[in-house]
Design a protein with these regions (language model features):
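Rhodanese-like catalytic fold shared by cysteine-dependent sulfurtransferases
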Residues: 1-25, 32-63, 72-110
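Short, surface-exposed ligand- or partner-binding patches at beta-edge/loop junctions that are enriched
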Residues: 67
Length: 110
């Protein structure tokens, strides 16, 4: 992968990254109750409201794919992360809803 990380990717690209063994961190910024309902395997939960306080838990040297329900909150989080030095933050377009519908039909949708 080049040093330039796209601002957003779709779920098919995320699946390809994971299948290729890429070192990608998955950050889910939904509320805890949403994360408990369904989550992409391997995701870490840091709700959007707590991101400024907890950003130090995130790696700056790895690509971070930011996830929410449909892509709105994760786009906000991605913009905040990039503004604060996390140049490898990437928004997952469509969020867990798109992941459930295209990649993992066994995942609960809400």
């Amino acid at each position: 992968m080049s040093d330039t990380v796209p601002l957003q990717i779709d779920v098919d690209t995320l699946r390809t990254l994971r299948q290729s063994g890429a070192d990608v961190a998955l950050l889910d910024v939904r509320e805890p109750w949403e994360f408990d309902l369904c989550a992409i395997e391997g995701s870490s939960s840091i709700p959007l409201a707590t991101l400024p306080q907890r950003a130090g838990e995130l790696p700056k040297d790895r690509q971070i794919v930011v996830i929410c329900h449909h892509g709105g909150r994760s786009a906000q989080a991605t913009a905040w992360l990039r503004h604060n030095g996390y140049d490898k933050a990437t928004n997952l377009m469509g969020g867990v809803d798109a992941w459930a519908r295209r990649i993992d039909p066994t995942m609960k949708v809400y």
